[in-house]
């Protein structure tokens, strides 16, 4: 399991600790990841994802998991999140076709 947000793609960064004397030592900046259970309204299921705190704020800002995944680009999502996105698109298309018929 990599230290990467499944929704935003936020991952580990590498930089330096810089002392007062300007000595530099390598360090890693780890993302603030949390195991979160998010509910899909369209699919009617709960999904457990590893999401950064900033990613969770983005999900809430966009109005939930479904809205976030529909607006997100595929290249920043994890494989599992891409699958969820495709399922949501398929389900909404089926619902729209049922209403039209």
UniProtKB/Swiss-Prot annotation:
GO CC entries: cytosolic large ribosomal subunit
Encoding gene, per UniProt annotation: rpmB
GO biological process, one term: translation
Keyword Glycoprotein: no
Organism: Rhizobium rhizogenes (strain K84 / ATCC BAA-868) (Agrobacterium radiobacter)
Example GO molecular function: structural constituent of ribosome
Protein name per its UniProtKB record: Large ribosomal subunit protein bL28
Stated family: Belongs to the bacterial ribosomal protein bL28 family.
Domain of life: Bacteria
Pfam families: Ribosomal_L28
Record keywords, A-Z: Ribonucleoprotein, Ribosomal protein
Keyword Transferase recorded: no
């Amino acid at each position: 399991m990599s230290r990467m947000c499944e929704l935003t793609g936020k991952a580990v960064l590498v930089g330096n600790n810089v002392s007062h004397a300007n000595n530099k030592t390598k360090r890693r900046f780890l993302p603030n990841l949390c195991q979160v259970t998010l509910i899909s309204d369209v699919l009617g299921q709960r999904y457990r994802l590893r999401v950064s705190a900033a990613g969770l704020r983005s999900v809430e800002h966009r109005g939930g998991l479904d809205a976030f995944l529909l607006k997100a680009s595929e290249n920043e999502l994890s494989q599992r999140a891409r699958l969820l996105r495709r399922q949501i698109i398929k389900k909404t298309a089926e619902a729209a076709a049922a209403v039209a018929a």
